């Protein structure tokens, strides 16, 4: 950490919490293009060129601020098709360069806090917990004994000014915050960053680092209430939560604390020790062993927290209270539920025998076949009721490329839904993709499916017998299972780190 600070010359800047001067350091832009805070950052020759010269950066920022005050808008307009050149330079190109460097600078205070937190602690070298599938064993272990869940949709992005005010807790440098305001005014699409897929796709190609930083910070602020509650109550302490960057208190714009004065008066509402929280992207789940009254209090508390701290109206319908015993949880593409499994026990006492009816809770994960067919329909693999269709967009490819694309798609789906308790839904998806592949090939060769398969043989579609299906037999070949038990086995993989939209699959 000392080497990191010395390389970035942070000791002097940190004396007054200044990070704005780092924007004028040329190696920041080399670091931005290196795409990481831990790749080649200690090399003496960072590999940057004279395009990121200090003089250019100073002139552009000065001109940016002047234009902002004179014309009341950014002159670096993304939608400006003319792309005028000022100061002898392409302003759109250099504004993008400053944007990328600024994203690195804004990450530094958080990165230093993380390094400080990890100092003296043993790092976990395993990356297994990065997998999305690692959530489901946790749900199976913890949620089986819970009664109610809060199904939470994190509210839409807040006003940019509120975001800046919230960021002041972590970043004390006023100059950097002013520059952040300029960038947020330049990109008004921030308000649709989370809710509209087109905006996410747009930012994935341009300014990805900066907007992912804002998105993660935005969501992290919503989650920080749970860490705050844990610190205030001994009932809510949890070892796993110490990985969060913790806040001490929450503030309004006016100079008074929101929760600390009246906190003891309302803390009794949440003395339930069995609380479990998981989140993926904009959807979160809070489970409790308590009653519906307790969950209603949690819902009321979260709504009031969002409204008082973020100055925004959060609709109550974004939080749903569901009972696990009679509700399926739609999370991460699976339908998860807790059902009672009846169990009959025979007890023998001397000459008498008794039948004891018992029931145990079991956590089920199922593949939502209706949702999957709708996704395949949107991607033009089948019609709305699940009848396979040809894929015209792929008909121009070679036969091997067409087969490989369909095979790769099914392999990915079977890989992800290997945790489904019943495989019949997955077999139906396999049928749709196999026949869609055959119809695409027949369309390309201007033939019917029957004539095409008769000419080339049905063995052509055996390519769809993927290694995923062989895993079941290779894994459990030494264990005695009936066919029904093997059919219901679940496998969770530890290499799945993201979910892509099927409609955008190419």
Curated annotation (Swiss-Prot):
The keyword Membrane does not apply. HAMAP family: MatK (MF_01390). The lineage of its organism: Eukaryota, Viridiplantae, Streptophyta, Embryophyta, Tracheophyta. Usually encoded in the trnK tRNA gene intron. Probably assists in splicing its own and other chloroplast group II introns. InterPro entries: Domain_X, Maturase_MatK, Maturase_MatK_N. Its main location: plastid. This is Maturase K. Belongs to the intron maturase 2 family. MatK subfamily. Keywords: Chloroplast, mRNA processing, Plastid, RNA-binding, tRNA processing. One of its GO terms (cellular component) is chloroplast. GO terms for molecular function: RNA binding. One of its GO terms (biological process) is mRNA processing. It comes from Phyllodoce empetriformis. PANTHER family: MATURASE K. It is found in: Plastid, Chloroplast.
